[in-house]
Amino acid sequence: MTADQIRSLQPELAALLESFRPYMNRASNFGHLLAYVLGLLADLKRKSIEPIALAAGTAVRTLQEFLSFLDWDHEAANDHFQRQVMDRHGCERAIGVFDASGHVKQGRMTPGVQRQWCGETGKTDNCVVGQHLLYTDNHPTNPFNCVLASDLFLPKEWSEDRKRCSKAGIPDDMVHRPKWRIALDQLRHAIGNGVRFWFVTFDEDYGKVPAFWSDLDALGQQAIGEVPRNFHVFAKRPACRSLQRAHGSKRVDNLCRFSPVFRNQKWRQVTVKETTRGPAMWEVKAARVHLTDGSTPSRPTERQYWLIIARNPETGEIKYFISNASASVSLEDMLTAAFARWHIEMWFERAKQEAGFGAFEVRTYRSLLRHWLCSRLAMYFLAAQTQRLRGEKPGDHAGTSGRSDQHAGDINLETHLALAG
């Protein structure tokens, strides 16, 4: 995008960001925020601090200081962001999606960098991993998507090296937490800011943890998530405590294959999402089961959950899902939420391409969080503008679901400018 095109976006972006001014503490900081977000939206080969500063005509050191130590409250700004999303785009059937994203980085100085699994490359790599929470209205033709929270996953090796943490500006009380615990903290915080989700959904890295389910229950949050085939459940609660194998928990793949409650069912076709090629249909069976108690794995939970087996009739792919939804919730609704995970995958892809989400070159924890916030605000701007230019009203499609051929936040800036003109 040319310098003229960047300037043409500035009034609309400034208007959207105006409500964040109180958290900038100084007028100059608001100017830096605007310059940095505009730079993230620009068509630059690299979207790290130096090329953004050069394109904006700002001193490189100024933007470095803006991210690292200038006095503005990025945490309060993010709280405001969450409240604003609910005020302007809230809907009754909003879905929250948990996922982690890896960013390949060299060296040892970037906070949290380590050889670990990196989804970006599909292998163990030197990378930084973030844990994120996405909000989507799951609209079939123009979904509104934005990431409400981003936090650093701190590896154990970092957590145990407090000197290294101190050099990276990582707080003394910040320790290693598994991604599912970070996700729960993000959800609690968002709920505190008025965010409400019809369902939250996630992959098996979260779903395989019984304690994750019990904590979601404690929050009163309806959820559905994928689980691995060796996840254990109880088909029913034993009448009394028993150590007999026949009364124990079973792998979900074996239960779905051999238990009469599944064998006696016929496969039922369910539309899980709408695509440009028409409805995506999967065959499903479902039953009510008990999970293993997180504190005592040999004991079943008091409450029941849904166990759903879903089969793609075209490829034969099998997925297993657990849901804490009530017995009255339909399979269609549960699977609509379960198959909404694609929104965050596409958001990551577009955010890295369009808004420099993974282009950070920082050495402090605060700088990393601030970069992620600015990138998320850039994506929010695109999503809000796309929705406005297409004549949508927030929450108009609260009862709809499915996949889109185009999605908010996915529009490139040349298209945006053409629509704006």
Language-model segments: residues:
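An anionic, glycine-rich sequence signature occurring as long contiguous blocks
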Residues: 14, 139-164, 168, 172, ...
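Electropositive nucleic-acid engagement tracts
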Residues: 25-29, 36-108, 115, 212, ...
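Short, conserved catalytic/metal-binding motifs centered on acidic residues
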Residues: 52, 92-106, 133, 200-206, ...
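Active-site-proximal, Lys/Arg-enriched surface segment
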Residues: 68-156, 161, 292-296
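Short, basic/hydrophobic alpha-helical segments
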Residues: 80-85, 174-198
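Short amphipathic alpha-helical "interface-anchor" segments enriched in bulky aromatics
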Residues: 98-102, 206, 256-258, 329-362
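Acidic, metal-coordinating catalytic cores used for nucleic-acid/nucleotide bond scission
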Residues: 202-209, 229-231
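Basic, amphipathic alpha-helical segments enriched in Lys/Arg and hydrophobic/aromatic residues
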Residues: 355-417
